[in-house]
């Protein structure tokens, strides 16, 4: 779809959506997004120019259907997939991608760390994906030197970052905000550093006694990104891994640096979103969102959860969806899903489904709470179908139609029950919606009550 859009841009020094927006040009991607979001193209351009909205759209991802992440647009959901040294293969990851897209993932991150050829699995995912693909390049940087921190150089990081851009990756998690002076602040935490990318860079800095190379070479990374229109997803290496560690000095020190880096990327007209926690008590979620907006000049916020309790292994998709809904309500732009396998193992296809639906609920609830135009239309339509016992319409409007139909049919499988004016919960005699009271009857009752009140 995008080949004809991209062709005139080839060879230009800066092909980012932000660069076009700041020069007053509405790209085809901006126009496409405006139609999807039911917003004026001029508003999309203004928000991209301001940095409050991003359109992750690498010029080499030609089959991409552009989408937007920002407070002006709907709250989005990301799904993580990826092979590990102990499980998965390329075909399985492509199937996870297709499942994630089927159940509504707005973006997908390939977090493969081994077990397969990382370049091949990434290329296969990009070729099959209509949604933006994100990656974490430090994983492959370490894998490229066979896990040897002492052999890992600054140029190794930049080489892998550019390779991901060349393949068509739309956004990359760059852990540039973790500085060597932040590391002592981790002392006193229960779970230390829980970011894999952050852990790699912490080891690198401790081993070499040097500043984070992604920070010192940040301008070089910007130069790479603007050639391909790859978007920064600034990683939060010091995100809290438990409630005890939430909103501590380490997390907030890194957040301040992420704000500095956001503005540096904008000087290059490169798009940015900022990643956030993690594990956060409910009473601290609003503070975390507001603090990010303040420090990072309202760049889109992208949070993992957050989980609101630490005692829910096997059900972390529920614990985190609670926090995600709150974060979305307060202004977070994208929610990274958590599956039931979080903290326990590599998710399978069913885990991807469970996590995605939980997060689609959270994002949708946030859009309703923020009074986005049309956000509740589908809910109202389903409610009308429910009141009229239109079972097939109810299934169709559900976030997971297959699951809704499956649960209904467990007790009433025959087709005749798709027209029944009851379900197995109340049965035919006790459903309150079965005894419908007409508007005419209610008007008559109102008149009589008013008569009684007047004559009393």
Curated annotation (Swiss-Prot):
One of its GO terms (molecular function) is carbon-carbon lyase activity. [4Fe-4S] cluster binds at residues 423, 426, 431. GO terms for cellular component: cytosol. Its EC number is 4.1.99.17. The keyword Iron-sulfur applies. Substrate binds at residues 80, 109, 139, 175, 195-197, 236-239, 275, 302. Its cofactor is [4Fe-4S] cluster. Binds 1 [4Fe-4S] cluster per subunit. The cluster is coordinated with 3 cysteines and an exchangeable S-adenosyl-L-methionine. Keywords: 4Fe-4S, Iron, Iron-sulfur, Lyase, Metal-binding, S-adenosyl-L-methionine, Thiamine biosynthesis, Zinc. Zn(2+) binds at residues 279, 343. Catalyzes the synthesis of the hydroxymethylpyrimidine phosphate (HMP-P) moiety of thiamine from aminoimidazole ribotide (AIR) in a radical S-adenosyl-L-methionine (SAM)-dependent reaction. Belongs to the ThiC family. This is Phosphomethylpyrimidine synthase. It comes from Prochlorococcus marinus (strain MIT 9301).
